[in-house]
């Protein structure tokens, strides 16, 4: 929800899959939103009979890294939200910690998040939609669930937050939320509200 990486990962997969004569549309990528890269690779490998998943992963990471260097930006409104916030903030992600920190550095958000404020799937047993990453964050920092709100941009993430018994705001400001995607996806996953504007997040937090 901070760095606009999902759309860039989609570009990396689209580029790589062309090697197999496969064109993947936005609708198919939307179904992967919030999933770990290795999970997406497993799904595509089985669907399109790609045997070498290790090579698949290495190539995708190389392509994605090159795209990141040139195109990675913050989600619209994210920088202002973070820089103006006096809230106690943490990150809970299905990405790897090293990758998250690198992304924060690239978009100049690293000064707002210390490494210990970043929680990633490699720190827990199960990735989202299981609640492990959020439960670890809550426990490590003695956070009170009723005083905590999670902001998520995927159904997988929303389900993880709800499973952790925390209120979730759905955010559709990222580039992967193309016009054909319906915010109902996040509401049905359990978000109590959905917005496409970071400026509205503070009001939603205050009202809850």
Which residues make up each language-model segment?
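Asp-based phosphoryl-transfer active-site loop
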Residues: 1-8
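Conserved SAM-binding loop
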Residues: 2, 89-92, 150-151
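Conserved phosphoryl-transfer catalytic core
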Residues: 9-31
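Helix-loop "lid/cap" segments that line or gate small-molecule binding pockets
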Residues: 16-17, 36-50, 103, 138, ...
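Short helix-capping segments at alpha-helix termini
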Residues: 19-22, 48-51, 108-112, 142-143
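Metal-dependent phosphoesterase signature
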Residues: 23, 43-80
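Short, acidic loop-to-helix structural element flanking the phosphoryl-transfer center
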Residues: 66-91, 97, 101
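Asp-based, Mg2+/Mn2+-dependent phosphohydrolase catalytic module
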Residues: 96-208
């Amino acid at each position: 929800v901070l760095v606009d990486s999902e759309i860039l990962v989609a570009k990396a997969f689209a580029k790589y899959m062309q090697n197999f004569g496969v064109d993947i549309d936005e609708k198919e990528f939307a179904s992967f939103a919030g999933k770990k890269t290795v999970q997406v690779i497993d799904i595509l490998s089985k669907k399109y009979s790609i045997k070498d998943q290790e090579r698949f992963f290495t190539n995708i990471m190389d392509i994605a890294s090159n795209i990141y260097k040139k195109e990675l930006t913050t989600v619209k409104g994210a920088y202002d939200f973070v820089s103006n916030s006096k809230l106690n903030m943490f990150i809970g992600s299905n990405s790897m910690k090293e990758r998250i920190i690198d992304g924060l550095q690239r978009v100049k958000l690293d000064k707002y998040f210390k490494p210990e404020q970043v929680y990633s799937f490699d720190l827990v047993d199960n990735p989202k939609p299981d609640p492990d990453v959020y439960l670890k964050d809550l426990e490590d920092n003695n956070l009170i669930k009723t005083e905590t709100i999670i902001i998520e941009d995927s159904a997988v993430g929303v389900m993880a937050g709800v499973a952790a018994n925390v209120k979730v705001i759905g955010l559709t400001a990222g580039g992967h939320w193309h016009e054909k995607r319906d915010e109902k996806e996040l509401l049905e996953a359990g978000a109590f509200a959905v917005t496409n504007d970071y400026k509205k997040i503070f009001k939603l937090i205050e009202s809850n």
